[in-house]
Amino acid sequence: MIAFDQLTWLHGKPQSSGLLKANPEDFLVVEDLGFAPDGEGEHVLVRILKNGCNTRFVADALAKFLKIHAREVSFAGQKDKHAVTEQWLCARVPGKEMPDLSKFQLEGCQVLEYARHKRKLRLGALKGNQFTVILREISHRQDVETRLQAIAERGVPNYFGAQRFGIGGSNLQGALRWAESDAPVRDRNKRSFWLSAARSALFNQQVSIRLKKTEFNQVVDGDALQLAGRGSWFVVTPEELEVSQARVHNRELMITAALPGSGDWGSQRDALAAEQAAIAEETSLQALLVREKVEAARRAMLLYPQQLSWNWWDDVTVELRFWLPAGSFATSVVRELINTTGDYANIAE
C-alpha cells in the first residue's frame, strides 16, 4: 500500500518546506450547508464557532445542556479539535419551547445563531467547506507561487487526506488486522473508521498509479465520467472519447476512480482493467469491503479548489482562501504546495 506521503504529486514534489498549523488560528474552516434553517420544526439548528473542541465533545455538551440523549444531537461533518471551526449542530427538541441557547457555555465555544428546522441534520448533508489556511516558514516563495498558479489552472489530485487514516495510520492498520481476522468488530465507530480508511487507501492508490503512468486527465475507454458538481456518472465509449475529452478539459466532466466494495465498480474495459491492476495486491482489504457489504461507488480523481486566492504577508508566510466540496481535503491542496511540518493527521475534513 502506498503511504500518504509517497502518493504521486500532480505538479511534482514541492521544493519548499513550510509549517502547517503553527497554531489553531492558522486553520479556519467554515461549514457551508447549502441551505438555511426552515424556521419551524421539531429540530433546532445551532451554528457554533469553536476553538480547541472536537465536534463530538461539543455535541455531547449541547445534549447535556438541553437535557436530551446524546443521540438526539447530530452534525453534518466532524471538525477537528486543533483548528478554528464554524459548523452547525442539530438537536431534536420536539414539543418544547425554543431553548435559550445564548446561555449555553463551553470553553472555546460560542453560539452564533440558532433556529428551528424540520429535518434532522445527517452526516454528509453539507455542500462544502470554506477554508482559510496560513502557511508559515516557507523556504521557497517562488516555487509556492508557481504552484498556486498551476493549481488554479489544473487542480490537485482528489486524495483522501492523512487524517482519514488516523494518527500514525491507526485506522488503516486496524482495517488490515480486521481483514486478516474472522473476529467481528462490534464497536460501531471502529467499524466505520476502519472501513472508511480501507476504501480511501484503495482509491488513493488508484489515483497515484494512474497519475504516474499516464496523462492524468486523459480519458480512456470505459472511464466513468461524472457530471461536475453532481454524483451521477456514465461510462464513455470509444466513439465518445474525443467529445468527452473536450468536456473534461472544460471541467464539465470529471474522470472518476473506484471506491471499491461490493457490486459493480462502474467503469468498464480499459479503465476497469487499470483500476483492478492498481490495487491487485490489496486482496485482503478488497475482500473486507465486500464481506462487510460496503457498496462500491465512484469519486472524482481531480479536485479544483473554488474561489482560490492567496495573499503573501511576507516572503515566508502566505494566507490561502478556497472552498472545497464536501468530502474533499484541504491537505490535498497543501501537499502540492509545500513539504509540510505540522499536525497533518489531525486536520478537519
UniProtKB/Swiss-Prot annotation:
For this protein, the record's InterPro entries field holds: PsdUridine_synth_cat_dom_sf (IPR020103), PsdUridine_synth_TruD (IPR001656), PsdUridine_synth_TruD_CS (IPR020119), PsdUridine_synth_TruD_insert (IPR011760), TruD_catalytic (IPR042214), TruD_insert_sf (IPR043165), TruD_pseudoU_synthase (IPR050170)
Q: What PROSITE patterns does the entry give?
A: TRUD, UPF0024
Q: Which reaction does it catalyse?
A: uridine(13) in tRNA = pseudouridine(13) in tRNA
Q: Where does substrate bind?
A: 27, 129, 329
One Pfam match, by short name?
TruD
Q: Enumerate the Gene Ontology biological process terms.
A: tRNA pseudouridine synthesis
Q: What GO cellular component is one of the record's annotations?
A: cytosol
What residues form the catalytic site here?
80
Identify the residues that the record assigns to the TRUD domain, covering every copy.
155-303
Q: Which enzyme class?
A: isomerase
Q: What is its EC number?
A: 5.4.99.27
Tell me one GO molecular function of this protein.
RNA binding
Purpose of the protein? Responsible for synthesis of pseudouridine from uracil-13 in transfer RNAs.
To which protein family does this belong? Belongs to the pseudouridine synthase TruD family.
Protein name per Swiss-Prot or TrEMBL: tRNA pseudouridine synthase D
What gene codes for this chain?
truD
